Amino acid sequence: MNAFIQGLPKVELHLHIEGSLEPELMFKLAKRNGIDIPYSSPSELREAYQFEDLQSFLDLYYQGANVLRTEQDFYDLTWEYLEHCKADNVIHTEIFFDPQTHTERGIDFDTVLNGISRALTDGREKLGITSQIIACFLRHLSEESAMETLQSVLKHRDKIIGVGLDSSEKGHPPAKFLRVFQQAKEAGLLTVAHAGEEGPAQNITDAIEMLEVSRVDHGVRCVEDEALVGSLIETKMPLTVCPLSNIKLCVFDEMGQHNIVELLRKGVAVTINSDDPVYFGGYMTDNFLAVNQAHPMIKEELAKFTLNAIDASFIDNELKAQYRHKVEQYVAQHSSM
């Protein structure tokens, strides 16, 4: 089954590009930009990736992002991620970036976006990987800061498909950003939001009803509300679940306790994603393997994660049909093996 998982076409919908910064690249960029980092080697830095909760991870995440200064830095970061996508048979990815993480420290919005966008264009042409960009607001910052960021996003509608909401969920409910999301929707942007990771099931309901999201990022605490689970099934609201992330951040103690396969079998439109793969110990294939090891599935169930992701993606129906066919063909070819 491992070989089947490796070759399975995959679609990633929940990936923070800053969270794909490999320690080796971090050291390279620190040297390039003359920045001191408080670790003597990439391996020492890797050893620091032990987290008690979301906040302990975010502290290290923001520290790492500090080495990203130039358009070329953001290009290199994104290109390395795309090479991992190619190795994992990811055919389409929709990446998050956090503008405020960079603008708050004096990096121009366009510097960030142009580097990411240029790499994604090369990824389409050289690797055959299609992509979309989603700009996320940091929920621990103010509504005013998010509104300012939205104005920058709106200048780049040709590159940015939608907006999201991430960072620490505790104490920052969806309602805080209602007006920002209303303005984004009025401008024609699609919307997604992190909810129900560390926060309660009510945050999922609020993200759907208040922010009118097309997808819920994480959403695993939906099981605390039976009516909500029923609604997710009925409306086919996608959840972009990140299994290894959930273990690393102690949302679940171990993969055997994770509810993603239970939700899949109930009919919830769950997808598998890597979130911040460098910090959480795995890219897409690693996440699929970890889930299947703890909850053995048949090939059709594994493929359903990709089919759900295709349906939930922000691409046109023609490309969705092509990708569905690709997955169905792959399963058919391997059904007797």
UniProtKB/Swiss-Prot annotation:
CDD domains: ADA. Substrate binds at D276. Binds 1 zinc ion per subunit. GO terms for biological process: adenine catabolic process; hypoxanthine salvage; nucleotide metabolic process. Keywords: Hydrolase, Metal-binding, Nucleotide metabolism, Zinc. It catalyses: adenine + H2O + H(+) = hypoxanthine + NH4(+). The keyword Zinc applies. The record marks H218 as: Important for catalytic activity. It is an enzyme of class 3 (hydrolase). The active site is at E197. One of its GO terms (molecular function) is adenine deaminase activity. Its cofactor is Zn(2+). It comes from the Bacteria. GO terms for cellular component: cytosol. Its EC number is 3.5.4.2. Zn(2+) binds at H14, H16, H194, D275. SUPFAM superfamilies: Metallo-dependent hydrolases (SSF51556). Catalyzes the hydrolytic deamination of adenine to hypoxanthine. Plays an important role in the purine salvage pathway and in nitrogen catabolism. Belongs to the metallo-dependent hydrolases superfamily. Adenosine and AMP deaminases family. Adenine deaminase type 2 subfamily. This is Adenine deaminase. The lineage of its organism: Bacteria, Pseudomonadati, Pseudomonadota, Gammaproteobacteria, Vibrionales.
